[in-house]
Amino acid sequence: MLYPSIDSLMDKLDSKYTLVTVSAKRARELKEDDQRGPLVGKPKSFKPVGVALEEIVEDHLQYERKEQ
């Protein structure tokens, strides 16, 4: 995968573990709910994980870290 780059993704989130968690949850949402499309206008990727990563890099997704 060339786009988005790992560097641009890491600028948006605080750790690679957060990146994996957020993108996996969003990809699952995209796969399960066909009525809601991607938040990006015209995604370059056809796979749900790729679309989720594009949404992260374009600031369409937000997450909230829960304090323990």
UniProtKB/Swiss-Prot annotation:
InterPro entries: DNA-dir_RNA_pol_omega, Pol_omega/Rpo6/RPB6, RPB6/omega-like_sf. Pfam families: RNA_pol_Rpb6. The keyword Nucleus does not apply. It comes from the Bacteria. Promotes RNA polymerase assembly. Latches the N- and C-terminal regions of the beta' subunit thereby facilitating its interaction with the beta and alpha subunits. The RNAP catalytic core consists of 2 alpha, 1 beta, 1 beta' and 1 omega subunit. When a sigma factor is associated with the core the holoenzyme is formed, which can initiate transcription. This is DNA-directed RNA polymerase subunit omega. The lineage of its organism: Bacteria, Bacillati, Bacillota, Bacilli, Bacillales.
